[in-house]
Amino acid sequence: MLGACLRLLVGALCTVCSLGTARAYSDTSPLLGSNWGSLTHLYTATARNSYHLQIHRDGHVDGTPHQTIYSALMITSEDAGSVVIIGAMTRRFLCMDLRGNIFGSYHFSPENCRFRQWTLENGYDVYLSPKHHYLVSLGRSKRIFQPGTNPPPFSQFLARRNEVPLLHFYTARPRRHTRSAEDPPERDPLNVLKPRPRATPIPVSCSRELPSAEEGGPAASDPLGVLRRGRGDARRGAGGTDRCRPFPRFV
């Protein structure tokens, strides 16, 4: 009886811990708690270049040669042949404007963010906007697509399995902790943040030129003022010493 009660108690504790863990990490990654299915990368190529469609955090859409966390997409079917594409890392919907330019948006619009998927004979897929009649394309040339014509470059996509480690989607970016000079003194006991004292220049009145030997008088025979130092110090007194100091003062 006691063993059965202990087993029930351990089971209840495990259930509570698992629920707490799921709640604690529910917002750390867009992949947790999502019903969108597996990750997919839309690959397109020409004879020279190949790219994966990626949606950046600012909504910009471009291509990358290799798979990244921003090229990881989740694709779901809305109705027969209609799909919605969202960036797994940015949570932005792939949308299209009236000129055929694609972008990522947080707000879903059925007219701009829903595409009709067709599979071509070569096995590649194209995504057509029913509203604007343009194909999703990473190329610069935009033209209205008509069935039976060749699609524009970088508009035929092949769905590829995700090869980016899932750890890259969960790891948070490191933050750099900095301090400023306005912090309280107890946060900077060694005065590292405070600026070092600067030496003030010698006043102009204190700088003197050495007399030339060609000049007459006692100054010429005693250019360094060794013999006249005693008399000069007596004349200056305490005030003159403060006013004309040869050494810099630190402020």
Swiss-Prot record:
GO terms for biological process: calcium ion homeostasis; cellular response to interleukin-6; cellular response to leptin stimulus; cellular response to parathyroid hormone stimulus; cellular response to vitamin D; ERK1 and ERK2 cascade; fibroblast growth factor receptor signaling pathway; intracellular phosphate ion homeostasis. Disulfide bonds join 95-113. Expressed in the parathyroid. It comes from the Eukaryota. Residues 175-251 are annotated as: Disordered. Following secretion this protein is inactivated by cleavage into a N-terminal fragment and a C-terminal fragment. The processing is effected by proprotein convertases. GO terms for molecular function: fibroblast growth factor receptor binding; growth factor activity; type 1 fibroblast growth factor receptor binding. The modification Phosphoserine is found at residue 180. SUPFAM superfamilies: Cytokine. Residues 1-24 form the signal peptide. Keywords: Differentiation, Disulfide bond, Glycoprotein, Growth factor, Phosphoprotein, Secreted, Signal. Its main location: secreted. Glycans are attached at residues 171, 178. Residues 179-189 have a biased composition (Basic and acidic residues). One of its GO terms (cellular component) is cytoplasm. It is found in: Secreted. Pfam families: FGF. Belongs to the heparin-binding growth factors family. Regulator of phosphate homeostasis. Inhibits renal tubular phosphate transport by reducing SLC34A1 levels. Regulator of vitamin-D metabolism. Negatively regulates osteoblasts differentiation and matrix mineralization. Acts directly on the parathyroid to decrease PTH secretion. Up-regulates EGR1 expression in the presence of KL. Interacts with FGFR1, FGFR2, FGFR3 and FGFR4. Affinity between fibroblast growth factors (FGFs) and their receptors is increased by KL and heparan sulfate glycosaminoglycans that function as coreceptors. This is Fibroblast growth factor 23. It comes from Rattus norvegicus. The gene is Fgf23.
